[in-house]
């Protein structure tokens, strides 16, 4: 491959779609001399990305896993309230509901859910959340309708190593994140599509850099890079494929590839749809090879936890905003990636103000 080249990038970091803002931490009295973190909600609207008459509200909850009672105890007072021990913060995505009601009431309904959880295992350690009780307004959410959700423990629990394999575990919602998006805009690329490779293909990757607002004394900085302006994280996402030869069998030049990429008119944003996520919007025409990577309206959602669980969990508790985006053209197989140079194209727009909010209490 040719050596890398860089093309100027336009972005406006002031727009709400480039940022996810933090929940302020508010403590409230419990009445028994103790304090607890006040439940809160946040609403982000991405309905300006696509003209649509039907919007959905995606619901992501953040809360804490408690162990209820002491399984080793053999005696005790019958009227005693069982002891609740805080084990870890966690995230549970409920799914979506039509945007037809009061969003604040929707958030309040999430706080009344009764959810238990337990560990399981397949090829990965799993956390199985069981919905015991949920208000009627949430019944159309996928997780509530199914009564359970089995998720990768590393991606959805802050400290899965603290969760025991036995005992009664309860998940208590404390923060509710509501994202309003056009119904057809949320498209998660099938894993099979992401694994396609071939010597006659180029891989298109998105190198996303995210600024993270974090105190220099925080242990989180050990997982972040540092610049003069603060701390940041890097993500690498597979966003498409392009052929190395044209219809006449001739090798496609990088100039032609760059022209095709620019014609996609890509924009990138941060949101909380399936947990902290990078959203990609292609407003231009897409080739047959690129079509499976986007919805019919040209959007794609990349949960950050799939690329880097560690970065995703940092974004549970810290404000973040897009810093830069580059499109990297790589060879179509991992073997050739190892022995060829990459090619950079930085013509992607950063949606203004796409910010991720911090949830400060989520610490190990």
Swiss-Prot record:
Residue interval(s) of motif FPIV motif: 23-26
InterPro entries in UniProt: Matrix_C, Matrix_N, Matrix_Paramyxo_C, Matrix_Paramyxo_N
Signal peptide: none
GO CC term (a single one): viral envelope
GO terms, molecular function: structural constituent of virion
Pfam families from the UniProt entry: Matrix_Paramyxo_C, Matrix_Paramyxo_N
Gene3D superfamilies in UniProt: Viral matrix protein, C-terminal domain, Viral matrix protein, N-terminal domain
Main location: virion
Keyword list, A-Z: Host-virus interaction, Viral budding, Viral budding via the host ESCRT complexes, Viral envelope protein, Viral matrix protein, Viral release from host cell, Virion
Compartmental location: Virion
GO BP annotation list: viral budding via host ESCRT complex
Residue stretches spanning the membrane: none
Family to which the UniProt record says this protein belongs: Belongs to the morbillivirus/respirovirus/rubulavirus M protein family.
Known role: The M protein has a crucial role in virus assembly and interacts with the RNP complex as well as with the viral membrane.
Domain notes: Late-budding domains (L domains) are short sequence motifs essential for viral particle budding. They recruit proteins of the host ESCRT machinery (Endosomal Sorting Complex Required for Transport) or ESCRT-associated proteins. The matrix protein contains one L domain: a FPIV motif.
Protein name: Matrix protein
Lineage, opening ranks: Viruses, Riboviria, Orthornavirae, Negarnaviricota, Haploviricotina
Gene that this sequence comes from: M
């Amino acid at each position: 491959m040719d050596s890398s080249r860089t093309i100027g990038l336009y972005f406006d970091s002031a727009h709400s779609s480039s940022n996810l803002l933090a929940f302020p931490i508010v403590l409230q009295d419990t009445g028994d001399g103790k304090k607890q973190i006040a439940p809160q909600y946040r609403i982000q609207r991405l309905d300006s990305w696509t003209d649509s008459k039907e919007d959905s509200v995606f619901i992501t909850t953040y809360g804490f896993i408690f162990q209820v009672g002491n399984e080793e105890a053999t005696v005790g007072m019958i009227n005693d309230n069982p002891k609740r021990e805080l084990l870890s913060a966690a995230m549970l995505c409920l799914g979506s509901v039509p945007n037809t009601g009061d969003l604040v009431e929707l958030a309040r309904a999430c706080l009344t859910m009764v959810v238990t959880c337990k560990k399981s295992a397949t090829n990965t350690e799993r956390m199985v959340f069981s919905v015991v009780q949920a208000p009627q307004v949430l019944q159309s959410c996928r997780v509530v309708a199914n009564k359970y959700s089995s998720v990768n423990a590393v991606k959805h629990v802050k400290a899965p190593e603290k969760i025991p394999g036995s005992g009664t575990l309860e998940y208590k919602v404390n923060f509710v994140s509501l994202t309003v998006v056009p119904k057809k805009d949320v498209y998660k690329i099938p894993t099979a599509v992401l694994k396609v490779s071939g010597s006659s293909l180029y891989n298109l990757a998105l190198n996303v850099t995210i600024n993270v607002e974090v105190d220099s004394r925080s242990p989180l900085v050990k997982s972040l890079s540092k610049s003069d302006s603060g701390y940041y994280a890097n993500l690498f996402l597979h966003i498409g494929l392009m052929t190395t030869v044209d219809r006449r069998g001739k090798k496609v030049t990088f100039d032609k590839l760059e022209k095709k990429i620019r014609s996609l008119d890509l924009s990138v944003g941060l949101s909380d749809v399936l947990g902290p996520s990078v959203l990609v919007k292609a407003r231009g025409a897409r080739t047959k090879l690129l079509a499976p990577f986007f919805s019919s309206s040209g959007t794609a959602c990349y949960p950050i936890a799939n690329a880097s669980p560690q970065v995703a969990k940092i974004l549970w508790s810290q404000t973040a905003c897009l810093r830069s985006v580059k499109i990297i053209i790589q060879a179509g197989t991992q073997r050739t990636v190892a022995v060829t140079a990459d090619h950079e194209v930085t013509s992607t727009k950063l949606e203004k103000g796409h910010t991720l909010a911090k949830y400060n209490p989520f610490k190990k």
